């Protein structure tokens, strides 16, 4: 698992929230526009892989599978 994906998964623990909006998840990429674009792609991939759940209005939460993966990183 790449470092940016780990940062995205760990964002929930960092912010101490069950649900994060896309802008909070972008923080994993810092101020680098390319990294923020990569975060968007990672979020889409994690949804497809079942690690994140879309909650509507650009909000996301960790699924049980995502919580397990976050504990491993």
Residue ranges of model-derived segments:
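Short amphipathic alpha-helical interaction segments
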Residues: 32-48
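Short, amphipathic alpha-helical interaction segments positioned at domain boundaries
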Residues: 67-73
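A short, conserved structural fragment
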Residues: 47-57
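Minor-groove-contacting beta-hairpin "wing" of winged helix-turn-helix DNA-binding domains
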Residues: 58-64
